[in-house]
Amino acid sequence: MLQTSKGSNSSSTSSSRSASISTATPNTIVEDEELLCGPKSELTPPAVANPLRPVSKSNTSVEDDSKPSFTYDLDVFNLCKEYLNTRNHHGLALIARQKGIPPILRFKVWPILLKSHPFVISPFIQPDSELLNESTSSRSNSSSSSSTGSNTPLSTAPGSIKDAAIIDGDANDNDNDSNSNSNDDDNDRDNNDANTKEKEEDEQNNKIREKIKRDLAKYIQRLKYSQSKYTVSETEHEILSILENAIMKFTLKWGKIIKYDSSLTWIALNLAEWFPPIPKTPWVLVGKEYSSSHQSLIVNFLDDYSNYIDNIPDLREYLERLIYHDEKISTISFREVYERLVLVLLHCPQPVSRRKKSDNQGQNQRRNQSEVQKDQQSFKVNKTTLPKTGGTIEERVSYFIYCLRKLIPELSQYFHEEQILTKFGCLDDEWLIWWLKFCGTKVWSKYDRGRIWDFMLGWRLKNPKRDFNYYYEKLNYVNRNTLEKLGPDIFWSVGNEEEDISGDNNVDANANEINNTEKTETGKLVKREGDIKRSSFKDLVNELSNELHISKRVSTDEVATSTSSPATTKMASSSSTSSTLTPNVSIPFSRVDPHVALIFISLSLLKSKENILVELDQHEIRQFLSRLPSKSYKYNQKRSTRQKRISYASNASSTSNSPMGQSPVDRDEDSIFPTSRIVISNDSKDQKHKVNFIDNIISEAGELWRKWLWSEMVEDN
């Protein structure tokens, strides 16, 4: 827990870098956390003169095996740099949701994405039930007191003595003196009430600040569990002070909607693992992946990716300019980034009653509580609207359990036998809240969480009023081949490319007729004029495909001079009107709500750990899911693992009758891992360190989404 002076409560980032912080002592951690240490173990502050040097005394103390895996297509990386230099949030959002932002650029990209995020522009956070009840009771008390005051006799109402004297017309000097004394008494009473209220607020704020300090100290204790005593350095103290002030200011601003919870501190801590809290420095928190014997709580974020940086000429110089000299791209403070990130992670759709009220502002009558609950119940079970609109945390948890039973029945049955999800809401099952409500905060690996947050921060829907040319211009007319490398939306559904082509004005009626016939014969679900009986899930598929996908036809000459994707090539060659149905350029947009997508990502993570989970008991499972290790495997096993995946995908596509089991690209090795791509890797030369494949987890989440959608459509028929 940090010791801060009373005047630092409202201090800014600049004020937190005062002389008082530079004289940090072992007293910066309190005894009740058992983290006190003697001066002998006090850390040497990181050298400021050479901030790119690792905090550790030598590079040899950190093995290559501890470096995270990172491979990234060079063309996409250069495109990301181009969009960053021009602050192009359209292009950065596209890369973020499709491939993820390079970790070494997140500290500049995330602020740009957050500034333009729909959930920041139109924020809505689900209010805490306790605060909601307090607000309702206070309004009712205020209403009753006002009605009581209106029925009070005039002579006893505040300020009524003067009015009564004027009405009576017989007021004398004594009456005036009495009136003056009464007004003075009223003013004194109001001042006393205001002072009392201010003191209560100060006491409440002090309690919140103490909770924040205690949670920050728990983070240190969690990382340094093998050390009974630990002292923070000057730089660490400054970083933790910035975090404390950011959390406190957010709580003061949004305290009437949500009360302080430890999750707010953990969001700040996890943000500080990628975004340096101190401006113009590379220092970030290390995260739980580092050994408890690591000398410091902070690390230079460039050190983890030194192999990748050294493989690209002039990249290190470019990053140093971004860190120390940038005044144009992004200079936003940690506090502002933190507030916007919380608005995205904790966002939920407005209740039905609130949406209707905003649409009909002239109607002032409130719906009673039973009607609102009825609407929420109907929305809770409406699986055709939840994927698009999202829902409250209660609705998402119910949806998660439903999908778990449907998509991973064996694991679901084991969870049922072990009673893993039967005590939802208790401390035993709080891992699920951290997964779904707080988007992996605290419980996931920083590397997995960073990639998933990339996906959520890059979430964008297509504006139906904008055409292809508008977005293509916003992307600065990106090269077709580079755009193809980004691939389709992860949560794609059937009928997107084909429907766009069949609906194009350049295609004649015969081509449309042939196209529709082919779709029907192959099981592709397409809206036809003659259909009478239609499934609600078919409507959902068509709605997702038509509204959230945008593409434009490419002429035959352009196709001849450019490389087509496997999906569009296969589609064009299979059609009898290939001369007309030429491949198209696609700009993928988000299709499902990001928090619903997070549900399928969570299911994919559980599926990847299934073999481990079935070997554990109740307590071990909950502990494991509360500190989920990074999904990784040895680099020298990558080849065999890849072959297994390809074999499994091939068998699944040949045995499955579901058209959703087929990917928009061919499932051969060359299409999954094209040899023509220039991919720069952070891998060590000995190829023995672990490789993170969270991208595969996210891709598997898309497969689970299509599997769920297909099964629901079959049952709906």
UniProtKB/Swiss-Prot annotation:
User: Which residue intervals are annotated with compositional bias (Low complexity) in the record?
Assistant: 1-25, 132-155, 504-515, 560-582, 647-658
* SMART domains registered for this protein in UniProt: TBC
The entry sums up its family as follows: Belongs to the OCA5 family.
Asked if the keyword Secreted belongs to this entry, the reply reads no
Ranges of Basic and acidic residues composition bias in the record: 189-209
Q: Which residues form the Rab-GAP TBC domain?
A: 100-460
Q: Which InterPro entries match?
A: Rab-GAP-TBC_dom, Rab-GAP_TBC_sf
Q: Mark the transmembrane ranges.
A: none
The entry's keywords: Cytoplasm
Kindly indicate whether the keyword Cytoplasm belongs to this entry.
Answer: yes
Q: Where is this region: Disordered?
A: 1-66, 132-209, 353-377, 503-522, 555-583, 636-670
User: Which gene produces this protein?
Assistant: OCA5
Q: Where in the cell is it found?
A: Cytoplasm
Biased composition, Basic residues: where in the chain?
Answer: 636-645
Cellular component per GO, a single term: cytoplasm
Q: What is this protein called?
A: Oxidant-induced cell-cycle arrest protein 5
Q: Which domain of life is it from?
A: Eukaryota
